[in-house]
Amino acid sequence: MSKVQEILEAVKGLTVLELSELVKAFEEEFGVSAAAPVAVAAAPGAAAAPAAPAAAEEEQTEFDVILTAVGDKKVNVIKVVREITGLGLKEAKDLVDGAPKPVKEKVSKEEAAAIKAKLTEAGATVEVK
């Protein structure tokens, strides 16, 4: 049995918690992030046709942040929308009242995640496309 097969057999016997610890140990030891390899590793298990759209999604560099619902903290959401977009009070209120509407379009993944976090913290429901 080759070393690779031995390691594979050992990994098969691990619990989910142990696998999580193994991933963290790899990240610390080699200074890498397991986020991308996990997404790539999931694609080969899919059928051949759906694998192509999955690859296209991974390569997506621009995202739209959509405000889908306001919740009961409308004033806080308006404040955050103004902060994010630079809109005036009336424009921000109109955007919030007209939900679902895009708050910001064609932003990076990191910026989209930050915007989503701010709006969610303010009480809004947000979708990133």
Curated annotation (Swiss-Prot):
CDD domains: Ribosomal_L7_L12
Main function: Forms part of the ribosomal stalk which helps the ribosome interact with GTP-bound translation factors. Is thus essential for accurate translation.
Recorded family membership: Belongs to the bacterial ribosomal protein bL12 family.
Protein name as catalogued: Large ribosomal subunit protein bL12
Pfam families named in the record: Ribosomal_L12, Ribosomal_L12_N
Keywords of the record: Ribonucleoprotein, Ribosomal protein
Any one GO cellular component localisation term in the record: cytosolic large ribosomal subunit
A biological-process GO annotation: translation
Single annotated GO MF: structural constituent of ribosome
